[in-house]
């Protein structure tokens, strides 16, 4: 039995206290609050520092762990097709809701006050780019140059190619995959350390926001939080509910079945924390072990439905808050970019924030990366909605793909979801499929 963690030592509580202090300082001493801006800026720079290496490690390992493409390619193709279809739907739903509810309208933030030097740097290099230019820009001149300049799409291009190459290498590539996997763990260790500074960044950003723009801005930020939670709730029960029903099982009963994992995610704000438990339960539900072993870990990089919803809503919120008028074509272009950058989002606390920074950095200065300062104080409180939606989305995806592959014991699933205690699932032909190595923490 674990020792109970003191209430005040939880990051969630510390950020909440920091936000309250920032709001108080900004309201009572606006001039002093506005001077707290460097605290938020410093935290953003620390997060931006980690973007390229984290995307590189997570994407390479995620693709490489799919295993031998010749033998499990059918499952992989179906999984990737499902992931792209559902995450695209999540992005579009987020776009529709944020445009209908307009949570950022009325903030009237001057983007130049967020970080004038960086804004000038982005806008100076912004050019009207046609499709051919955009596609050519995705290809880096050099790999080192892509990392040095922080060109996220170029880093993604190299990462995908390397992941595919390691997959083709088979056993010879496992050492490299293992090293990169451990490297990604180390990177997230750094992120965990940086997230301890989140209260300081939240305090500085909130004090600056309230001091500069008034207490009324807090209402708009709270509205964004409500919009994200509402959209995730609707996505789970309407979209995933329809997918589950079409696939022959009850989403509600499935949620009851994985309630322990949902509560774990609620407490940690990380869907990764429930990965071992959800895999075990999916196997017990009747999904074949090889399908579970391939779909679940791949989904943790490629099927983050909650994160996709958040990314679209947050990006458009920043546009609304800074009075950047986006055309429909530009908003669809953001979705196109997010289809790429969201694949680098890790299912850990802070992953969505990192990916949002990566996305804004690819838009040629149209939206200021420094607009993230508006979200530091509330990002942590939206992570529960994202993480739980990610968890449920990956669980549903695994059951659906297992059924497509005829690797699902339908009768066993029915008994388990109805609360029966059937015997251990029998071995199936699918159990002979090569199972990709999966390391859990």
Curated annotation (Swiss-Prot):
GO CC annotations on file: plasma membrane
Biological process according to GO: L-aspartate transmembrane transport
Location of the region described as Disordered in the Swiss-Prot/TrEMBL record: 416-441
Record flagged with keyword RNA-binding: no
Main location as per UniProt: membrane
Top-rank lineage group of the source organism: Bacteria
A Gene Ontology molecular function term of the record: fumarate transmembrane transporter activity
Gene3D superfamilies according to UniProt: Sodium:dicarboxylate symporter
Chain ranges passing through the membrane: 13-33, 43-63, 80-100, 146-166, 188-208, 223-243, 309-329, 334-354
Localization (cell): Cell inner membrane
Alphabetical keyword list: Cell inner membrane, Cell membrane, Membrane, Symport, Transmembrane, Transmembrane helix, Transport
Pfam families noted in UniProt: SDF (PF00375)
Keyword Protease: no
Membrane-protein topology: Multi-pass membrane protein
NCBIfam families reported for this sequence: PRK01663.1, PRK13027.1
Similarity section: Belongs to the dicarboxylate/amino acid:cation symporter (DAACS) (TC 2.A.23) family.
Name listed for the protein in its UniProt record: C4-dicarboxylate transport protein
Lineage: Bacteria, Pseudomonadati, Pseudomonadota, Betaproteobacteria, Neisseriales
Gene name tied to this protein: dctA
């Amino acid at each position: 039995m674990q020792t109970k963690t003191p209430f005040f030592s939880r990051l969630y509580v510390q950020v909440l206290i920091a936000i309250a202090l920032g709001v108080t300082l900004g309201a009572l001493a606006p001039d002093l609050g506005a001077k707290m801006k460097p605290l938020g800026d410093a935290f953003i720079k620390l997060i931006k520092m980690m973007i390229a290496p984290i995307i590189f490690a997570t994407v390479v390992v995620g693709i490489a762990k799919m295993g031998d493409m010749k033998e499990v390619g059918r499952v992989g193709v179906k999984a990737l097709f499902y992931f792209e279809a559902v995450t695209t739907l999540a992005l579009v739903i987020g776009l529709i809701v944020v445009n209908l509810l307009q949570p950022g309208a009325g903030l009237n933030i001057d983007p130049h006050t967020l970080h004038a030097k960086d804004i000038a740097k982005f806008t100076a290099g912004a050019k009207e780019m046609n499709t051919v230019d955009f596609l050519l820009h995705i290809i880096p001149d050099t790999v080192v140059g892509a990392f040095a300049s922080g060109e996220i799409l170029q880093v993604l291009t190299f990462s995908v190619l390397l992941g595919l190459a390691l997959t083709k290498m088979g056993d010879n590539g496992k050492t490299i995959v293992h090293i990169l996997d451990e490297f990604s763990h180390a990177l997230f260790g750094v992120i965990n350390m940086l997230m301890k500074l989140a209260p300081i960044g939240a305090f500085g950003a909130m004090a600056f926001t309230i001091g500069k723009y008034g207490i009324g801005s807090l209402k708009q930020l709270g509205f964004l939080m409500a919009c994200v939670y509402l959209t995730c709730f609707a996505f789970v029960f309407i979209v995933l509910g329809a997918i589950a029903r079409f696939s022959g099982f009850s989403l509600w009963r499935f949620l009851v079945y994985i309630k322990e994992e949902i509560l774990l995610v609620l407490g940690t704000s990380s869907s990764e924390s429930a990965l071992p438990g959800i895999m075990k339960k999916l196997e017990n539900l009747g999904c074949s072990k090889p399908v579970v072993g391939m779909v679940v870990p791949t989904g943790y990089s490629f099927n983050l439905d909650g994160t996709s919803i958040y990314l679209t809503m947050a990006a458009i919120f920043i546009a609304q808050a800074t009075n950047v008028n986006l055309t429909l074509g530009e908003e669809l272009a953001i979705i196109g970019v997010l289809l790429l950058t969201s694949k680098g989002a890790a299912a850990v606390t802070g992953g969505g924030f990192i990916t949002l920074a990566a996305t804004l950095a690819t838009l040629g200065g149209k939206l200021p990366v420094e607009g993230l300062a508006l979200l530091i104080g509330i990002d942590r409180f939206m992570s529960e909605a994202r993480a739980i939606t990610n968890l449920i989305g990956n669980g549903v995806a695994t059951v659906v793909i297992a059924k497509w592959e005829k690797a699902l014991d339908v009768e066993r699933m029915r008994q388990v979801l109805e609360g029966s205690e059937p015997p251990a699932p029998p071995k199936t032909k699918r159990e002979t499929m090569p199972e990709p190595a999966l390391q859990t923490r």
